[in-house]
Structures are given as C-alpha cells and as structure tokens.
C-alpha cells in the first residue's frame, strides 16, 4: 500500500492499471482501497446505455454535516498508441530524471493522486468541519454517457447536495497554477448532406453536381464570423472537420457531398439561437439555387451535451486563487478556453471550477509529469481544502 500522503506513489499505482476507456482495469478498485483506508465510504455504481459498454464509477464520501466539497475526475485514459514509440512502457509509471512517465499521468490520474494525497495530509493535521466527496468516472474519454452525467443524478437521488466542486483536469499551461478554468464554451456539431444526381462528367446536363452548391453553403458558414467574443470568452468559431463525396472516380459526378462541422460557442449564444443562425444562412443560399430542386441540402444536428457556462462564484474562485498564490506566489489567469470537460454536467448541481497539472503532454506519446509539479499541485490542493472549510 502506498504512503497516502505521497502523490507519486498513488499515481504510480493508478498508472499501473491499464484503464483505457471504458475499461476499469483495476484503477477504481485501487483508488477505493486508498479511500477506504482514509475513512471514506465508497460506492461503485455501474451504468449502461444502448450501444455502449457498461461503465464502472466511484463515489466516495466522508463527513455528515457542513459545507460539501466535491472533487471530480476520471480514471479512464486514451489508448497509448504504438508501444514502440514510448520511452518507457505506458503503464509502468517509471520515474526518470525528475519525471514520472505513463498514460494518464497528466490526464488525469495525476490530479486524482494529488487530491488524495492532499486530503490525507489535511487529515493528519486537523479535523475538517464539513463533507468531502470524490466523484470519479471511467467514462470521460469516451462517449461520456455512462459516467459523470449519470453519477451526478444517481448521487442526487440519494440525497447528495454539494456546496462547490473542483475538477482536477490539467488546466495549467506552463507551470502549475498559471491557469484555472471558470467556465467552458459550448459545443455543437452538424452534418450537412448536399443531394445531387450522379452522372458521367461528359454529360453534365443529365446529372446534378452537388459540389458547386456545397461550396456556396460552406462559404455561408465560414465567411462571416459568428461574433467577436466577450469579456470572459473567446469568439465563437465554426470549424469544418470533414468533406466527403464517397467518389474516387475521376469521370463521375458524385451523387452527394457530406460536410461535417463543429461549433464552439460563447455566452452570446444559446444552442437554439446558434442552430437557427446556421439554418437561416443555409436556407438563404438554397433559395438562390433551385430552391429545393436538385441539388439541395439536408442538415442534421448531432445531440450535444456541452452547453456554455460561466462560474460566477467569487468566493470559490478567490479561495482557489489565494491557495495558488500562497504556494507559488503567482495569481492565476481565470480562463474559459479549451475543449469541453465533465464540468459541463456538474455546473447544473453546484458552482464548479477546474484546476490541475500542466497539460502539455496529455494524450501524447511519453505523457509525463514532473515530480515538482506533483508536489506543487498537492500543496495547493491541501491549502485550498483547508481554506474552503475555514
């Protein structure tokens, strides 16, 4: 059993569980052993959904009264890729020249290890007047259908309510504590299919080429910016992610063209407003091009679980910022940049902020974290916990 105040030993134990999403591979069981030894009551609900594998989750709680701090995270990791490219095996947790290597070291077993060690250090020195829980899923890197979103609902039905939540995602950029996340942009994806009529390129009058209309529709999506951004958010942006005709032949006019796109949007928009804006742009182009005759387009919106949000709880933000300053001497930047995370689910239950290790190597070959970064984050978490319950 690792020394529970040592984040490196905890992280090594977690990394040695090859928990490639959505497989548990012993990671939650290992974490449960640590938490049980510390005095937590641990439960392991399993959730399922159609066309997905069952996923194990963990909810651990200590305390019965007072403010309730939730720490949220995930033990599932992305695949390591070609093992030949790794300096050290990705599931051994080798420490070399001040760095600990392994898949999940940064995203985000390292954050979990630091919080567990931080809380163990707190318990050695004082009694917390409040409640602490860990909400840990094995389905964050995958479709995120059987993880945090269901675990929150399950816990709420059991009477759980939280004062605030800290998500241990790797938010830092260059050094531990330089950036915390106080919100996230929303995300929505669409598939536009432009229908034509297949034919021989030598006889275009017998066909209806979907590509000229597709190019005009694409231009309507990208030529005008959605907005200029806000005080707390970057400008919303639409990115094309795929264009395909399924036609490798040089002498065939394709039957259709398919365009995939994703939009990351700020708090100037709701999902419904944004969908209406895109639909209006496309309809205007179509009305000038045969108005529903071949070629024409169809638009499908992909269900999204990522709405835009901004945490405005000054007390929570200041408590974390002050903890960072007391350990590092620096004041963190409050940011909303980057992709989505499970904070998008938690924000419906309590104020939530995100803070963790530097993320330069996450999802990469030779993912690693420095020994110094682990100690710094553990110290900040410890200070934050103490101040939260002060």
From Swiss-Prot:
GO terms for molecular function: acetylornithine deacetylase activity; cobalt ion binding; succinyl-diaminopimelate desuccinylase activity; zinc ion binding. InterPro entries: ArgE/DapE, ArgE/DapE_CS, Bact_exopeptidase_dim_dom, DapE_proteobac, Peptidase_M20, Peptidase_M20_dimer, Peptidase_M20A. CDD domains: M20_DapE_proteobac. The keyword Nucleus does not apply. Disulfide bonds: none annotated. It catalyses: N-succinyl-(2S,6S)-2,6-diaminopimelate + H2O = (2S,6S)-2,6-diaminopimelate + succinate. Zn(2+) 1 binds at residues 74, 107, 169. Its cofactor is Zn(2+); Co(2+). Binds 2 Zn(2+) or Co(2+) ions per subunit. It is an enzyme of class 3 (hydrolase). Its EC number is 3.5.1.18. GO terms for biological process: diaminopimelate biosynthetic process; L-arginine biosynthetic process; lysine biosynthetic process via diaminopimelate. Homodimer. Belongs to the peptidase M20A family. DapE subfamily. HAMAP family: DapE. NCBIfam families: DapE-ArgE (TIGR01910), dapE_proteo (TIGR01246), PRK13009.1 (NF009557). This is Succinyl-diaminopimelate desuccinylase. It comes from Bartonella henselae (strain ATCC 49882 / DSM 28221 / CCUG 30454 / Houston 1). The lineage of its organism: Bacteria, Pseudomonadati, Pseudomonadota, Alphaproteobacteria, Hyphomicrobiales.
């Amino acid at each position: 059993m690792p020394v529970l105040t040592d984040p490196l030993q905890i992280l090594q134990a977690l990394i040695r569980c090859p928990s490639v999403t959505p497989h548990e591979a012993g990671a939650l069981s290992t974490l449960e052993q640590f938490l049980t030894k510390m005095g937590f009551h641990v439960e392991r609900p399993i959730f399922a959904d159609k066309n997905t594998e069952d996923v194990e989750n963990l909810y651990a709680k200590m305390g019965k009264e007072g403010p309730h701090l939730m720490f949220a995270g995930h033990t599932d990791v992305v695949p390591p890729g070609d093992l030949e490219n790794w300096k050290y095996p990705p599931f051994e947790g080798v420490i070399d020249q001040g760095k600990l290597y392994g898949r999940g070291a940064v995203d985000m077993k390292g954050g979990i290890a630091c919080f567990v060690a931080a809380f163990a250090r707190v318990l050695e020195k004082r009694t917390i007047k409040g409640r602490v829980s860990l909400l840990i899923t094995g389905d964050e890197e995958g479709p995120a259908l059987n993880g945090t979103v269901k675990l929150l609902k399950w816990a709420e039905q059991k009477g759980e309510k939280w004062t605030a939540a800290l998500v241990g995602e790797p938010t830092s950029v260059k050094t531990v504590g330089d950036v915390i996340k106080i919100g996230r942009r929303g995300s929505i994806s669409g598939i536009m299919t432009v229908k034509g009529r297949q034919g021989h390129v030598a006889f275009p009058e017998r066909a209806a080429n979907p590509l000229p209309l597709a190019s005009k529709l694409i231009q309507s999506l990208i030529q005008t910016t959605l907005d200029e951004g806000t005080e707390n958010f970057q400008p919303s942006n639409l990115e094309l992610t795929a264009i395909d005709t399924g036609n490798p032949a040089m002498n065939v006019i394709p039957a259709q063209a398919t365009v995939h796109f994703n939009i990351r949007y700020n708090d100037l928009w709701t999902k419904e407003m944004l969908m209406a804006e895109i639909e209006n742009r496309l309809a205007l182009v179509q009305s000038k091009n045969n108005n529903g005759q071949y070629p024409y387009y169809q638009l499908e919106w992909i269900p999204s679980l990522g709405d835009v949000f901004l945490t405005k709880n000054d007390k929570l933000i200041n408590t974390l910022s002050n903890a960072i300053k007391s350990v590092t001497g620096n004041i963190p930047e409050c940011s909303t940049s980057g992709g989505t995370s499970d904070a998008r689910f938690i924000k419906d239950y309590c104020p939530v902020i995100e803070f963790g290790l530097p993320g330069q190597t996450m999802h990469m070959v030779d993912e690693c974290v420095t020994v110094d970064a682990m100690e710094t984050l553990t110290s900040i978490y410890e200070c934050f916990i103490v101040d939260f319950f002060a």
